[in-house]
């Protein structure tokens, strides 16, 4: 049980995919303009990351490995991620049309989010079992969501602040992201991974 808690803490805080491993930066910068959009994107990404971790593990363990087709893992994982994203898009469209319109192009772009493929490949490299794969995927998604929502909240506050002209827009966003990364660096050593 302690191992599972360590997996969650390490993926959420210590080895955060956005701020430490620099995966998923496109949606991090693109959707963080408004808190509402960031929360919707974080929910969709959490669902996709967790489900694609499960499906990728199952595809590799029960299809690729027994047939000695491990060299097809990247292509297979991309296909699995695309299917999961399409499923998520259909669910969001049916359950929340407003969120579907707000997320717009960013929802299908989860397919190209390198964090989703990175989680699937890292699960494989770490030789995680099924439960560890699910927790690793969920922890990565929770870490992504935490950082995305915090960053969106900060960007909303910065938008109403008096920022020097040279730093407005993407410049202050990158500076803020760098400071967040330094703050998360403080979690290093919290969990030995």
UniProtKB/Swiss-Prot annotation:
Q: Which keywords annotate this record?
A: Cell inner membrane, Cell membrane, Electron transport, Membrane, Translocase, Transmembrane, Transmembrane helix, Transport
Keyword Lyase set for record: no
Enumerate the transmembrane spans. 5-25, 38-58, 65-85, 102-122, 134-154, 171-191
Indicate where this protein is primarily found: membrane
Q: Which GO terms describe its biological process?
A: electron transport chain
Keyword GTP-binding carried by entry: no
EC numbers, comma separated = 7.-.-.-
Q: Which GO terms describe its cellular component?
A: plasma membrane
How does the UniProt record describe the way this protein sits in the membrane? Multi-pass membrane protein
From the Swiss-Prot or TrEMBL record, state where the protein is found: Cell inner membrane
Provide the top EC class: translocase
Q: What does this protein do?
A: Part of a membrane-bound complex that couples electron transfer with translocation of ions across the membrane.
Q: Per its UniProt record, what NCBIfam families does this chain match?
A: PRK05151.1 (NF003481), rnfA (TIGR01943)
As for family, the record states:
Belongs to the NqrDE/RnfAE family.
Which HAMAP family does this chain map to? RsxA_RnfA (MF_00459)
Q: What is its quaternary makeup?
A: The complex is composed of six subunits: RnfA, RnfB, RnfC, RnfD, RnfE and RnfG.
- What name is this protein filed under? Ion-translocating oxidoreductase complex subunit A
This chain's source organism reads Marinobacter nauticus (strain ATCC 700491 / DSM 11845 / VT8)
